[in-house]
Amino acid sequence: MTAVDAPDLLDYDDVLAKYEPVLGMEVHVELGTETKMFCPCPTEFGAEPNTQVCPVCLGLPGSLPVVNEAAVESAIRIGLALNCSITPWGRFARKNYFYPDQPKNYQISQYDEPIATDGHLDVVLDDGTTWRVEIERAHMEEDTGKSLHVGGATGRIHGASHSLLDYNRAGVPLVEIVTKTISGAGARAPEVARAYVTALRDLLKSLNVSDVRMDQGSMRCDANVSLMPIGATELGTRTETKNVNSLKSVEVAVRYEMRRQAAVLEAGGEVIQETRHFQEADGTTSPGRRKETAEDYRYFPEPDLEPVAPSAEWIEELRGTLPELPWVRRARIQADWGVSDEVMRDLVNAGALDLVIATVEAGASPEAARSWWVSYLAQQANTRGVELAELPITPAQVAQVVALIDSGKLNNKVARQVVDHVLEGEGDPEQVVANHPELVVERDDTKLKAAVEEALAANPDIAEKIRGGKVAAAGKIVGDVMKATRGQADPARVKELVIEACG
């Protein structure tokens, strides 16, 4: 039996009873440089196919590469932020393989002399514990082109009638970050994988070296998974699940592979060393191709490029450009806001921290900003099936809503209607309020007093309770007035008027 012939998945608890999961993460990051790694072609995302190419990135005879200094700077800054040692002598190498999206039939990468080695990244798990992920290396390379397979049901080459090639991406600068073996996590292995990619994304975003858009492929994660029988010392055969394109999918893919491989082993089969593709629709993986070894790529030094030899002075200069790193920033903000570890974890896990920070910077209080992003806006994101940051509302607009509430123009209920209008593309909150005056809180006490008197007259028993000192009974009257005013009144002011009327 092979990996392809796997029976039903093994229960997760049964997997953990017999096997120790072993992971290795490889993350490719497209650098946000204006030009490609070895030529002056632009790197703009979404351009018309094959409009950002030249003889160098197409591998035409006689063309020679030139190293992009900005890409080297970004690679060194990434290595420093990951606590790596920066090599004083890094060499490019040719990685030889044939594939249609590789126009030269080799990729310029780094092999045994990468730009950065031996680092670590401490990641915070859901319960607040810290897990150290050791970094093996970070190396520079160029991206491949992009294949579009037409006519098949899956978008892959199998079953396609023909394929199209876009070489705009060929030669875009990449840094590949490779971890050392991640073991000992047990049941939390999928969580550790997701937490690592999350922390790495946040770090890279803070360095401003990439937009780290997993949905657009500027950050691509490959998850290597193997199982080792409990008590064994020899690692199992690994599979590599390619291009997992969301944080949630990282966790799902690792968990699925653990269960699938265990099912193969328990049925007497052997896990095949292969690449696999994650299926977003159902959370499964499907077989790709047999996984090559380093020897298969026949690496040798790139003869057209000199080694990269950053001086100690340049490295220290770049170290001085590192921003406040995410974990330092979070600790400072937590102290400034006076919130608990649990609150900060919830903000991070919800993907809301940067949004809340930006909303506070735009003028809202931390409590109000946090409330909007983790409650109503989180609900809207869930309903729309998008990430919180993808909602069509900005932190500045949320801060405007908070300001309108603080000024008394809106109450919390009506403010949600204003946010709905903003989400529908009707402009900033102030513009929405100007276009919908019926949403503004009623401030005319004469009208409110009339509504209060009407509600009290309709509920004489409750009015009597209030007169008898049972102030809590006023809630029913306040609710009736809010209903009568279609939510446009200030509940606090209505309650004051109710108590005055019964005094």
Swiss-Prot record:
<keyword id="KW-0436">Ligase</keyword>
<keyword id="KW-0648">Protein biosynthesis</keyword>
<dbReference type="InterPro" id="IPR006075">
    <property type="entry name" value="Asn/Gln-tRNA_Trfase_suB/E_cat"/>
</dbReference>
<dbReference type="Pfam" id="PF02637">
    <property type="entry name" value="GatB_Yqey"/>
</dbReference>
<dbReference type="GO" id="GO:0006412">
    <property type="term" value="P:translation"/>
</dbReference>
<comment type="subunit">
    <text>Heterotrimer of A, B and C subunits.</text>
</comment>
<dbReference type="InterPro" id="IPR023168">
    <property type="entry name" value="GatB_Yqey_C_2"/>
</dbReference>
<dbReference type="InterPro" id="IPR003789">
    <property type="entry name" value="Asn/Gln_tRNA_amidoTrase-B-like"/>
</dbReference>
<dbReference type="GO" id="GO:0070681">
    <property type="term" value="P:glutaminyl-tRNAGln biosynthesis via transamidation"/>
</dbReference>
<comment type="similarity">
    <text>Belongs to the GatB/GatE family. GatB subfamily.</text>
</comment>
<dbReference type="GO" id="GO:0050567">
    <property type="term" value="F:glutaminyl-tRNA synthase (glutamine-hydrolyzing) activity"/>
</dbReference>
<keyword id="KW-0067">ATP-binding</keyword>
<dbReference type="GO" id="GO:0050566">
    <property type="term" value="F:asparaginyl-tRNA synthase (glutamine-hydrolyzing) activity"/>
</dbReference>
<dbReference type="InterPro" id="IPR018027">
    <property type="entry name" value="Asn/Gln_amidotransferase"/>
</dbReference>
<protein>
    <recommendedName>
        <fullName>Aspartyl/glutamyl-tRNA(Asn/Gln) amidotransferase subunit B</fullName>
        <ecNumber>6.3.5.-</ecNumber>
    </recommendedName>
</protein>
<dbReference type="InterPro" id="IPR017959">
    <property type="entry name" value="Asn/Gln-tRNA_amidoTrfase_suB/E"/>
</dbReference>
<dbReference type="InterPro" id="IPR004413">
    <property type="entry name" value="GatB"/>
</dbReference>
<keyword id="KW-0547">Nucleotide-binding</keyword>
<comment type="function">
    <text>Allows the formation of correctly charged Asn-tRNA(Asn) or Gln-tRNA(Gln) through the transamidation of misacylated Asp-tRNA(Asn) or Glu-tRNA(Gln) in organisms which lack either or both of asparaginyl-tRNA or glutaminyl-tRNA synthetases. The reaction takes place in the presence of glutamine and ATP through an activated phospho-Asp-tRNA(Asn) or phospho-Glu-tRNA(Gln).</text>
</comment>
<dbReference type="InterPro" id="IPR014746">
    <property type="entry name" value="Gln_synth/guanido_kin_cat_dom"/>
</dbReference>
<dbReference type="Pfam" id="PF02934">
    <property type="entry name" value="GatB_N"/>
</dbReference>
<dbReference type="GO" id="GO:0005524">
    <property type="term" value="F:ATP binding"/>
</dbReference>
